[in-house]
From Swiss-Prot:
Location in the cell: Cytoplasm
Keywords for this protein: Cytoplasm, Exonuclease, Hydrolase, Nuclease
Protein name stated in the entry: Exodeoxyribonuclease 7 small subunit
HAMAP family referenced in this protein's UniProt entry, alphabetically: Exonuc_7_S (MF_00337)
Functional description taken from the UniProt entry: Bidirectionally degrades single-stranded DNA into large acid-insoluble oligonucleotides, which are then degraded further into small acid-soluble oligonucleotides.
Gene: xseB
């Protein structure tokens, strides 16, 4: 079975579904643990995609050809 890489938006949507299901509290302990584990994996995927986007943004070049460093707030 081929696995398609999720987009950031798909991962966020699935993560939101998992959070809603966990907040509902009707799943069994085993199902809750499985959903929690999947949620952690999706969170890591989203973080990786955001870091990748941040690196791409950092390489934006000005008209003079100078790199504009990207600095996150609070860093």
């Amino acid at each position: 079975m081929a696995t398609k890489k999720k987009t950031f938006e798909e991962a966020i949507a699935e993560l939101e579904t998992i959070v809603e299901a966990l907040e509902n509290g009707s799943a069994s302990l085993e199902d809750s643990l499985d959903m929690y584990q999947k949620g952690i994996e999706l969170t890591k995927l989203c973080q990786d995609k955001l870091q990748s986007a941040e690196k791409r943004m950092a390489k934006v070049v000005t008209d003079a050809g100078e790199e504009i460093p990207f600095e996150a707030d609070g860093e």
